[in-house]
Each structure stands twice: as structure tokens, then as C-alpha cells.
């Protein structure tokens, strides 16, 4: 895999993948096969739509040299989804995208799984244990008003911001479970409505 980053000259595209990284072009070659910048831009858009926290800087790091197995897994799953589910994917993108999947899969040989975290994800992010607003949770309608709400080790209380919303259990395995409050039902069955009468049910 050969990657060349260009910082000067007129940008070949107005896409945020270039502008937010201060680049004018990204030239990527996979086993002598050039990867078009338009394909990289489309790939990033789909990856970011599926995983909003995966930003332009993370994507560039992934292209240059993957350094985290979990991020690499997300990266590859989105590429594979494009190949298997995106019906309008231009035919000339299939070979270079397949090459990316094949080549980047080999990085798993070098990368080791993350050490288990002993920190509570919710405690670290939430202020004073209060619900906080989030955008674009995969599995919920894009127009839904969403909040992350404490559960399990955290007391379930009545919060004013949750009026008119239902609570759903998250499938996350993170230490200290949490709930998602939404004014619209989820689009996937992996999120189920929270039943407070079953407190021992793990999210």
C-alpha cells in the first residue's frame, strides 16, 4: 500500500476528507491499483454515516497505517457493506475497494486487541450523571431526538428533558450500562424498550 499526501496546490476536490486534513490530494495505490479520491470520499461518507464518531482525521490515520484493531474492524465492515449492499456502487469501484479490504485485513496480524477498560464510559462523559444529547445513533431515525441516559449502577430518575420519550436498552457491552431515550422508535430490533420491572436484564 502506497500513500502520498499533498498539502499544496489546488485541491482536487472540495470534500471534507481533504479540507479538514489540510490536504489538496490523496494518492493511494493498492497493489499497483490506483484508488480514486472520489471512491475514498464516498467510502468516508458511508463510514461516517454509519459511525458518526469516525471523523476525517481517523480515516486518514486508517489509510496511512491502522493503529487500532477496533477502528480497523469498523473501517473494514463499512467497506464490505458497500460491496455487499450498496446497489448503486459504480462497477469500476468494486475492484479497488475489494483490494482495500484484502490489504487492510492483513493489518490484524500486527495489531493486538485493546486492553479492557476499567473506567465507566458514561461516568467519564456525562456531567454530574445527567443525560446528555447525542446525534445520529445508528439504528434510530436520523430526525430522532436522542439522549444517553444512566442505568444499572446509576439511579434511574425522572429527567425533564426525557418528557415524551421512551427508553430503549442498548446492546452495548460497555461497563455500566446505559439507555437511549428517543422520541421515535428504533429502526432495528436490537434495541428493545426498557422494562424497569426487570432491573437485572443487562443492556
Curated annotation (Swiss-Prot):
<dbReference type="GO" id="GO:0052170">
    <property type="term" value="P:symbiont-mediated suppression of host innate immune response"/>
</dbReference>
<keyword id="KW-1090">Inhibition of host innate immune response by virus</keyword>
<dbReference type="GO" id="GO:0003723">
    <property type="term" value="F:RNA binding"/>
</dbReference>
<dbReference type="InterPro" id="IPR043105">
    <property type="entry name" value="Tenui_NS3"/>
</dbReference>
<keyword id="KW-0694">RNA-binding</keyword>
<protein>
    <recommendedName>
        <fullName>Suppressor of RNA silencing p3</fullName>
    </recommendedName>
</protein>
<dbReference type="Pfam" id="PF05310">
    <property type="entry name" value="Tenui_NS3"/>
</dbReference>
<dbReference type="GO" id="GO:0030430">
    <property type="term" value="C:host cell cytoplasm"/>
</dbReference>
<comment type="subunit">
    <text>Homodimer.</text>
</comment>
<comment type="similarity">
    <text>Belongs to the tenuiviruses p3 protein family.</text>
</comment>
<keyword id="KW-1035">Host cytoplasm</keyword>
<comment type="function">
    <text>Acts as a suppressor of RNA-mediated gene silencing, also known as post-transcriptional gene silencing (PTGS), presumably through the binding of dsRNA.</text>
</comment>
<dbReference type="InterPro" id="IPR007974">
    <property type="entry name" value="Tenui_movmnt_prot"/>
</dbReference>
<keyword id="KW-0945">Host-virus interaction</keyword>
<keyword id="KW-0899">Viral immunoevasion</keyword>
<keyword id="KW-0941">Suppressor of RNA silencing</keyword>
